[in-house]
Amino acid sequence: MLRFLPDLAFSFLLILALGQAVQFQEYVFLQFLGLDKAPSPQKFQPVPYILKKIFQDREAAATTGVSRDLCYVKELGVRGNVLRFLPDQGFFLYPKKISQASSCLQKLLYFNLSAIKEREQLTLAQLGLDLGPNSYYNLGPELELALFLVQEPHVWGQTTPKPGKMFVLRSVPWPQGAVHFNLLDVAKDWNDNPRKNFGLFLEILVKEDRDSGVNFQPEDTCARLRCSLHASLLVVTLNPDQCHPSRKRRAAIPVPKLSCKNLCHRHQLFINFRDLGWHKWIIAPKGFMANYCHGECPFSLTISLNSSNYAFMQALMHAVDPEIPQAVCIPTKLSPISMLYQDNNDNVILRHYEDMVVDECGCG
């Protein structure tokens, strides 16, 4: 009678319902989160603004009771229930000579996509290049950004990796702030064929503007760019197992508001992540009100209700034959939560989880 709950989610809530929150086996919860083991982040990663905003918007909607499709990222216009912010694991390359006519900055960009599970479908991959804060009062030269796919693994001591065909070329004023590029097709190819992921080759040139009358020093511009440049990859995926169409739950008998404590009703249960030692990798929330259902479902609760209801029929059969189990106290309404956390690759992840909070209970 509990088949409408995902197995792992139900196992998690059942253990909590039995009052064993501190002792329960950690792997059940970690597996439900899509993790093989408890993350041990090497360093604290700041939460990107876009992830923080999406999380806060969802929290506000849940507080006010506004219904939202949490498997659709409105802010980005794509379907998905897992948002990952992957830091660049590449490094700078140093050309032998810097001039206005040559490359100002070269960098190998590398993003580890191994955290994406097999069932997840990529719906967005957005490369972000932060070129430093915007400045309208201290404009610099125009920059030309070129991106190449790296064809072979970089060999230590090699001056530059072997770039393939250029697939992005864009001119931007500097300082510009953040510049974004759509890498969905590239990321899909990397995800399907991990051995092809040798990274990206980024080249930035300083364009000479003879008409501006301003004499820029390329060396100064390049040095400032090396200090300010930060690259990241925002990846959104959709897990079809967790983002299915809304299901009609099997009807359960609502429990009347009676004073008897033994009857089926919702019990409050707050899960504090600090108490469990998970605050080191779960950024937000600090905990959540999971709740659970517990209590008896005697025949007297069902006799006056619709006789076609399955719970009423089971209660009736139990009255005839005690060998048949009674109707049980189950969740009739559950709500999701969103979580911000870090994984073992120092990725910041925003993930939506269905059926984590028990809102109402009934006999079913």
Curated annotation (Swiss-Prot):
Q: Give the family per the record.
A: Belongs to the TGF-beta family.
What does the record list as coiled-coil region(s)?
none
Q: Where is the signal peptide?
A: 1-24
| Residues passing through the membrane, by range | none
The main place the protein resides is: secreted
- Which cysteine pairs make disulfide bonds? 264-329, 293-361, 297-363
- Other notes: In contrast to other members of this family, cannot be disulfide-linked due to an atypical cysteine knot configuration, where the fourth cysteine is missing. This fourth cysteine is involved in an inter-molecular bridge to stabilize the active form of homodimeric or heterodimeric signaling molecules.
Q: Which disease is it linked to?
A: Klippel-Feil syndrome 3, autosomal dominant: A skeletal disorder characterized by congenital fusion of cervical vertebrae. It is due to a failure in the normal segmentation of vertebrae during the early weeks of fetal development. The clinical triad consists of short neck, low posterior hairline, and limited neck movement. Microphthalmia/Coloboma 6: A disorder of eye formation, ranging from small size of a single eye to complete bilateral absence of ocular tissues. Ocular abnormalities like opacities of the cornea and lens, scaring of the retina and choroid, and other abnormalities may also be present. Ocular colobomas are a set of malformations resulting from abnormal morphogenesis of the optic cup and stalk, and the fusion of the fetal fissure (optic fissure).
Q: State what protein this is by name.
A: Growth/differentiation factor 3
GO molecular function annotation: cytokine activity; growth factor activity; protein kinase binding
What biological process terms from GO does the record include? endoderm development; eye development; formation of anatomical boundary; in utero embryonic development; mesoderm development; negative regulation of BMP signaling pathway; negative regulation of epidermal cell differentiation; negative regulation of myoblast differentiation
Keyword Signal listed? The answer is yes
Propeptide found at 25-250
Could you tell me the keywords of this UniProt record?
Cleavage on pair of basic residues, Cytokine, Cytoplasm, Developmental protein, Disease variant, Disulfide bond, Glycoprotein, Growth factor, Microphthalmia, Secreted, Signal
General function of this protein: Growth factor involved in early embryonic development and adipose-tissue homeostasis. During embryogenesis controls formation of anterior visceral endoderm and mesoderm and the establishment of anterior-posterior identity through a receptor complex comprising the receptor ACVR1B and the coreceptor CRIPTO. Regulates adipose-tissue homeostasis and energy balance under nutrient overload in part by signaling through the receptor complex based on ACVR1C and CRIPTO/Cripto.
Post-translational modification summary for this protein: Synthesized as large precursor molecule that undergo proteolytic cleavage, releasing the pro-domain from the active, receptor binding, C-terminal region of the molecule.
Q: Is Transcription regulation among this UniProt entry's keywords?
A: no
List the GO terms this entry assigns under cellular component, sorted alphabetically: cytoplasm; extracellular space
Recorded superkingdom: Eukaryota
